[in-house]
Amino acid sequence: GRPVIIAISTNDALGINLQNIGKLMVMKHIYFVPFGQDDAAKKPNSCVADMTKIAETVEYALAKEQIQPVLL
């Protein structure tokens, strides 16, 4: 299959959505743009992808590899 690239930006990544993100991370052909907490003090469950890494993530995905580190 063709790769699917996901760049998350959500206020609930480390809440109830963590389960869904985890399921996607182990699926074949699904690749994540590296992401991390954007404001741990004010929004402890919030994560956002490093949008400057989209092109590099696509290059890796086309080679069937997940860019590392995926968690920032």
Per-segment meaning from a language model:
Residues 1-17:
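Helix-loop-strand module that forms the ligand-binding subsite of alpha/beta enzymes
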Residues 3, 30-31:
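Residue-level detector of anion-binding/catalytic polar loops
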Residues 20:
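Conserved binding-pocket/active-site segment within a compact domain
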Residues 27:
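Flexible glycine-/small-residue-enriched beta->alpha junction loops
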Residues 31-72:
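Glycine-rich phosphate/pyrophosphate-binding loop and the adjoining helix
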